[in-house]
Amino acid sequence: ANDNSDAQWGGVVLLGRAPVSDCNLTLVFNTTANPNANPQCEAQLEGTAVTTPYGGANSADNSGSMRFNQIRFSGFELEQGNELQSLTTGGTGSGTSLENIMSFNSSDDGVEFFGGTVNIRNLAVIGASDDSIDTDFGAQNFVDTALVVQRESTGDNVIELDSPDGPRTPINAIPQTRMFVNNFTFIQRSRESTSVVRARGAGALSLTNGVIDARNVCYRIDEAPTLAALIRIDAVVGACS
């Protein structure tokens, strides 16, 4: 392996029973105000050819702990749009502990949160070929202290936020995606990327205390409901086009 290697193996997957909005396995969606009201809402893991469900009704679900781990040269594509990231979490609950995690040269996303309520502290994503941090399926995440650096030859958004994401998911499916990122440095070097942060589908985003250095635009907010859902952008300095 060298500094441009990726897709040498699959990646790390953590699944749990915390709520997700996109029940693409059971199609039993939750549209009530209580995100824990629907234990039958399950989704199917990407990047695998066998049925691998996740999601449920336990926001505090515990999938264990990962601390001081480097995930290098990872990523696997089962088919177009069906891939494994360096770190994939699905319905992973807040009882799970993720600290001091590094993704290096993933062939897809660095980290993708499919629903769940897991938080992560001290995250570095270097050289992801797609999005560095991707969150969807109603994920409720706090990212505390993050460094993202793209390669020049590959990479899409630093953050991509969707809510809801699936084509069969109703727009009012609960939970709605919410992501909080505090203390961060984003360096967008990719010639293929058009924005640093992309949010859509009425997902809610908060960015505080950060620096953005980019070739292109800092923010792309799709649709009026997504702009209305924006929580805050506070104490963020950006050098963008």
PLM regions with names:
Residues 1-129, 134-241:
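Extracellular beta-rich repeat passengers
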